Amino acid sequence: MDQLLYRPKEAAKVLNMSRDKLYDLIRAGRITSVKDGRARFITADAMIAYVRQLEAEAAEAA
């Protein structure tokens, strides 16, 4: 990931999910987002943290 900020559509593509699913995760507090004016962005760090959280949950379930 070379970019620091991703628009929701871009972040959803990187995470291989729909934009609606991404917004559900943002509302649930599982992925953080930032706003610059009216524009919403997801940071690269937030996406990495989400993937690490998924890995930790999978390890606990195993």
Residue ranges of model-derived segments:
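Major-groove DNA-recognition helix of helix-turn-helix-type DNA-binding domains
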Residues: 14-41
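Short linear sequence elements within intrinsically disordered, low-complexity coil regions
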Residues: 11, 27-28, 46, 55
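Polyanion-binding surface elements
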Residues: 1-20, 52-53
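A short, Lys/Arg-enriched interface patch at domain edges and termini
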Residues: 45-62
